[in-house]
Amino acid sequence: MDVIILSFKFDGTVCSDLHIIKDFVEDVLDKLNKVIKDESVMFDVKLILNELVANGAIHGNSYDRNKYVNIFINVEDDFIRIEVTDEGNGFKCDLKSYDPLNLKCSGRGLVIVSGLSDEFYVEKNKITSVKYL
């Protein structure tokens, strides 16, 4: 089954307001739906994108509407690359220390994104997820 019709690139920025982010991400997903036809891949991409953009606004930018989250997406024949950068100071990511039995209110998002990604990188305030198609 062909997953991709054509290659696709997106580069956009959104302020750290979760209501605005919701509409912004929906618009990006509508554009991706025209390129990626596999529903299970789109489900993963939707979850990855929602988690990363929300994390950037909440944890990186502390909900500051004057700070922005940048999203870069590149879709090619065999992969989709999602890069999300916020204006925060960055953090050290240690997914191995996550304990699913510790019922914290945060911390699961990056574990989920890492699990859905074939490649996952954190560099200060930039997170990259690569999913092979």
Where in the sequence are the language-model features?
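Glycine-rich/acidic phosphate-handling loop/turn and adjacent ATP-lid/helix
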Residues: 82-106
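Short beta-strand-loop-beta element adjacent to the nucleotide/active-site pocket used for signaling
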Residues: 75-82
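Flexible, glycine-/charge-rich segments associated with ATP-binding catalytic modules
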Residues: 1-16, 115-133
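A conserved short beta-strand within the histidine kinase catalytic ATPase domain
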Residues: 66-74
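Conserved ATP-binding N-box helix of the HATPase_c
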Residues: 40-64
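Glycine-rich phosphate-binding loop
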Residues: 104-117
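Bergerat-fold GHKL ATPase/HATPase_c domain
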Residues: 1-47
